Each structure stands twice: as C-alpha cells, then as structure tokens.
Amino acid sequence: MSRVAKAPVAIPAGVEVTLNEQTITVKGTKGSLTRVINADVSVVVENNEIKCSSVEGVKTNAQAGTARALINNMVVGVTAGFEKKLQLIGVGYRAKIAGKGVDLTLGFSHPLVHELPDGVTAVCPSQTEIVLSGTDKQLVGQVAAEIRGYRPPEPYKGKGVRYADEQVRRKEAKKK
C-alpha cells in the first residue's frame, strides 16, 4: 500500500461524510464537495476516520494514495477553505472586482474580464493584489493559473501576474 494511503484522514467535528458506492460527499461549515473515487480504491468510514486502500495489485497503490490526498483536501476545504494570492507587477497593471468576475488591466489595448466559476470568490485588497478563495483546492488553483496565464512574469523586468510566494528567475540584459 502507498505510504500516503496508510495514514487515515481524520474527520473533524462539524464535518459530515457520506459514502455511496464510489461517490464520497463531504459537508462542512464552508459548503459541500462531492467526488467520484476510482473503482480500484476501497474507501471505508469508521471511528471518525476515512481509510483508503487499494483493491489489488501494485499499480492501484498509487491510486489509493491519490484518493486519500483528494479526500483530505476535501475535508480541509469544507472546514478551513483554500486561498491563492496573486500580485500584479507592472506600470498600469490593475485589478478590480466587477460583478461575478475580475476586471484586469494588464497592458493590452483592451481590459480583460475573467469570469469566476461557482465556488470561487475574489477579493482585491489593493489594485495590484487579488485573493482567490474557495472550498475546492483544484478549482481555486485552476482559476489562479488562468489569471496568471494572461500575463506570466517575464524574466527581464519581472513584470506580469505572479503568485504571492513565487520567486521569478531574473535574467541579465544583453550586453554590447
């Protein structure tokens, strides 16, 4: 069995877990998440713990570890939630919340409007910062990557949209 799958997922107080064949639903204070688990993985809920194990074979051990990590992210998401912080570095780069989306000015001839999916909320503490939050870790990360993809940080001046904890590798300008 995978080393990750050996550790059970603890169910904190206030979280309700429902298992229906291969579908697991986790409900908490921040909302509810549902996911279909691979058929090669058996999931058991007992004693306020969720245990994942592979049905048979070496190839399914990795699936058991993946299922355990996904279930753990669901439990953390409905209790604490996830957030990603983005910084806009560059002259005239701004962001503001516009209805159900984020209005971005990133040096193009037109402003960009990125529509936010259900389950993700955005806050702009300043014009050059965006904080995305939600219960689904994958969805929050995907939206952050899409916004970063409009203008990734460039290596010469460091301008662009970057994650708050991202270190941009800088290059030296060409010398004559």
UniProtKB/Swiss-Prot annotation:
InterPro entries annotated for this entry?
Ribosomal_uL6-like, Ribosomal_uL6-like_a/b-dom_sf, Ribosomal_uL6_a/b-dom, Ribosomal_uL6_bac-type, Ribosomal_uL6_CS
Keyword set includes Cytoplasm = no
Query: What's an example GO BP annotation here?
Result: cytoplasmic translation
Note one Pfam family from the annotation.
Ribosomal_L6
Entry keyword annotation includes rRNA-binding: yes
Q: Name one GO cellular component term.
A: cytosolic large ribosomal subunit
Q: Tell me the SUPFAM superfamilies matching this sequence.
A: Ribosomal protein L6
At the top level, the lineage of the source is Bacteria
For molecular function, the Gene Ontology terms on record are:
rRNA binding; structural constituent of ribosome
What are the UniProt keywords, alphabetically?
Ribonucleoprotein, Ribosomal protein, RNA-binding, rRNA-binding
Q: Which family does it belong to?
A: Belongs to the universal ribosomal protein uL6 family.
What the protein does comes down to:
This protein binds to the 23S rRNA, and is important in its secondary structure. It is located near the subunit interface in the base of the L7/L12 stalk, and near the tRNA binding site of the peptidyltransferase center.
Subunit structure and binding partners: Part of the 50S ribosomal subunit.
Protein name stated in the entry = Large ribosomal subunit protein uL6
Ranked from the top, the taxonomy reads: Bacteria, Pseudomonadati, Pseudomonadota, Gammaproteobacteria, Alteromonadales
Gene symbol of the encoding locus: rplF
